[in-house]
């Protein structure tokens, strides 16, 4: 999700502050920017298609949460879509066509991921604090979780599932006030038991399990850092530490995806690009657009890597509209790089 000081999300009724980030890297043809840490390899992304235009009612469009369904179609959420326009789109990346998958009169959805437990697709609604689920065909909407956790409502941003189907959510509570009140929350797969795993965080945004499900990576938007939560067998925290400090310049950390080799793909709001790190914190590469394509684009919020292959699709947005771009990832896609 993107951050107010870089681009305010004005005109969204009932939406306090949506912080929707992009990806920070060096611009094509320019010297490496801050935070390259020797990772001077460039993964060049190419445009697939424009999916959305800025909405008249909200003044912008912001794509997020790309996730492949079982038929190989790519689902994408449009965070700022008003009532009556597609809030989740289904894309045929081969034919370069899209269609409405879901819309409603309530949600500002910031992420999407299929549950390994019931096969439904789960969406985080940043505005209401709810987590909703849909049938695989986009129908049968249900509220999976709603209400306060430890006396405070959520602003759920991204989500990740463990192997059993329990949810782990980045809660950006406190972001609109500029206060470090954010949390990482675990919700059991029944939706009845919610536990705070970490708190006092600065607008947590991206969240993903590592390649072997031993722990969680999560990013903090306003601190430009990635932390690691080592989990025990019960899914609670064994330890927590700052793992990577991202020198993004004007860019801020957004969503995280993890490939089969454990590499992290970190979105940075403020630049339409993405930074790639190893699990040991080494900067490996920068995903960037051709220089001619960067005008009118401000963020590359998230990425889905094709399961079992290396073709990756990232969501890129700005005043010029919402786009899909593609590049070759460093390793194959797995669940941790498919939604969230």
Positions of PLM-derived features:
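Secretory targeting and sorting signals
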Residues: 1-29
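Loop/turn-rich, solvent-exposed surfaces of beta-rich toroidal or solenoidal domains
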Residues: 225, 245-282
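Short, solvent-exposed loop/turn segments at conserved positions within beta-propeller repeat blades
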Residues: 80-85, 126-127, 175-182, 221-224, ...
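Beta-rich, blade/repeat-based domains predominating
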Residues: 57-72, 85, 104-122, 149-167, ...
């Amino acid at each position: 999700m993107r951050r107010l000081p870089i681009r305010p999300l004005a005109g969204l009724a009932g939406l306090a502050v949506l912080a929707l980030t992009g990806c920070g890297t060096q611009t094509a043809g320019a010297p490496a920017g801050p935070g390259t840490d020797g990772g001077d390899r460039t993964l060049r992304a190419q445009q697939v298609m424009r999916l959305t235009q800025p909405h008249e009612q909200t003044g912008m469009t912001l794509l997020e949460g790309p996730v492949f369904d079982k038929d190989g179609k790519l689902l994408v959420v449009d965070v700022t879509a008003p009532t009556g326009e597609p809030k989740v789109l289904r894309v045929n990346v081969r034919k370069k066509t899209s269609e409405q998958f879901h819309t409603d009169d309530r949600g500002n959805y910031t992420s999407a991921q299929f549950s390994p437990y019931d096969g439904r697709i789960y969406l985080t609604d940043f505005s209401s604090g709810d987590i909703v689920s849909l049938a695989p065909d986009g129908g049968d909407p249900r509220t999976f979780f709603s209400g306060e956790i430890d006396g405070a409502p959520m602003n759920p941003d991204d989500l990740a599932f463990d192997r059993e189907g329990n949810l782990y959510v980045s809660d950006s509570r406190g972001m609109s006030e500029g206060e470090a009140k954010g949390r990482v929350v675990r919700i059991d797969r029944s939706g009845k038991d919610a536990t705070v795993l970490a708190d006092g965080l600065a607008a947590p945004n991206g969240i993903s399990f590592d390649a072997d499900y031993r722990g969680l990576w999560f990013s903090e938007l306003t601190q430009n850092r990635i932390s690691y939560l080592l989990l025990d067998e019960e899914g609670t925290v064994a330890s927590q530490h700052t793992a990577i400090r991202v020198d993004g310049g004007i860019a801020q950390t957004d969503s995280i995806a993890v490939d089969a080799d454990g590499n992290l793909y970190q979105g940075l709001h403020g630049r339409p690009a993405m930074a790639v790190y190893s699990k040991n914190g080494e900067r490996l590469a920068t995903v960037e657009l051709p220089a001619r394509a960067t005008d009118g684009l401000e963020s590359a919020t998230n990425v889905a890597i094709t399961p079992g292959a290396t073709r990756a699709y990232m969501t890129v947005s700005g005043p010029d509209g919402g786009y899909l771009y593609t590049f070759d990832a460093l390793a194959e896609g797995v669940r941790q790089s498919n939604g969230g």
